[in-house]
Amino acid sequence: MNRILDHIGIGRENAVTREELEMRMGLPDRTIRNMIEAARREGALIVNDGSGAGYYISDNLEDLKRQQKMNNSRAMSILVQQKHLRRRIKELEAKENA
């Protein structure tokens, strides 16, 4: 996977914030976020409970359900924005082609 997993603990009690990860790894926030996303895409069960406690690896049913719910909410928000973007793009393209 990627080396971010060497710095993210297992279980909520071992959660680490992005700021801590930045300090430990000497990397900027955006790089840390990209590494977390890449590890998740590769199958790492990195969760963030939204409380500010940070990131941790979990195999706990409730943790995973909470993360899934947060992910679904984000995905729906993006899809709604995409709908508005598509509509506006069509309007502008029609105006341009008129």
Predicted regions and their residues:
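Long, low-complexity, charge-rich intrinsically disordered regions
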Residues: Q67-A98
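Minor-groove-contacting beta-hairpin "wing" of winged helix-turn-helix DNA-binding domains
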Residues: S51-D59
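Short amphipathic alpha-helical interaction segments
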Residues: L27-A38
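Short helix-capping/hinge SLiMs at alpha-helix to coil transitions
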Residues: I8-N14, E42
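A short, conserved structural fragment
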Residues: R40-G50
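A short acidic, leucine-rich amphipathic alpha-helix
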Residues: T17-R24
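Short, charged/polar, Gly/Pro-enriched secondary-structure boundary elements
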Residues: L61-Q67
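Short, leucine-enriched amphipathic alpha-helices that occur as contiguous helical runs
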Residues: M1-L5
